[in-house]
Amino acid sequence: MKRVKVIPAFLFAAIVAVCLASCGAVQNPVEYNNKLMTVVNDNEKSMNEMNTAMAGQDYTKAETVRKSWTEKLDKAIGEVDKMDALKEDEGLKTAVVNGLKAYKKIADNDYKTLIDLRNKEKSGDATVQLQIQASLTKINNGFDSIAGQINHASTAFEKKYNK
């Protein structure tokens, strides 16, 4: 009977185990969904900071939050872009990336406009009220649209993988 060398056999088994464990292309749908939703939900912290600053009429802080938020969104977009899409995911990752880009556009443009208008209002310019209302409506509608698109994609993803 032939003797099998234990070390080479053990080393081979270890290499196979590591290769199988590191195959990132085969992902768990629940983990994939959770990771994407965590990235999206992390924006809530910045939204809350923005709301607190705006409600307190601290527009200098609001501008600081806005800039920080856009940086966080850039990182989040990059993180999701680098993720391997789950095989046959036809929309969730795309919806999340598009949603993050839309949040960034709101933070970059719409909140900047709103902060500028609120500063003018605080300085006594009462003529900006209609513009403020229009900005608030645009921001809220944008948030609703983003949430709707991500929720729609998430529901479709759940139906597909919840078999």
PLM regions and their residue ranges:
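Charged, amphipathic alpha-helical oligomerization/scaffolding segments
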Residues: 35-45, 49, 68-75, 79, ...
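Short, charged, amphipathic alpha-helical segments
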Residues: 34, 60-68, 90-98, 126-138
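A charged, solvent-exposed segment within the mature domains of Sec-exported extracytoplasmic proteins
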Residues: 118-163
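Short, solvent-exposed, charged loop/turn and helix-capping segments
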Residues: 76-100, 113, 117-118, 154, ...
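Immediate post-signal-peptide N-terminus of mature secreted/exported proteins
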Residues: 23-71, 159-163
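Short, charged/polar, low-complexity loop and linker segments
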Residues: 49-52, 75-88, 122-133
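C-terminal motif of bacterial Sec signal peptides marking the signal peptidase cleavage site
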Residues: 18-22
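Bacterial N-terminal signal peptides that target proteins for export
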Residues: 1-12
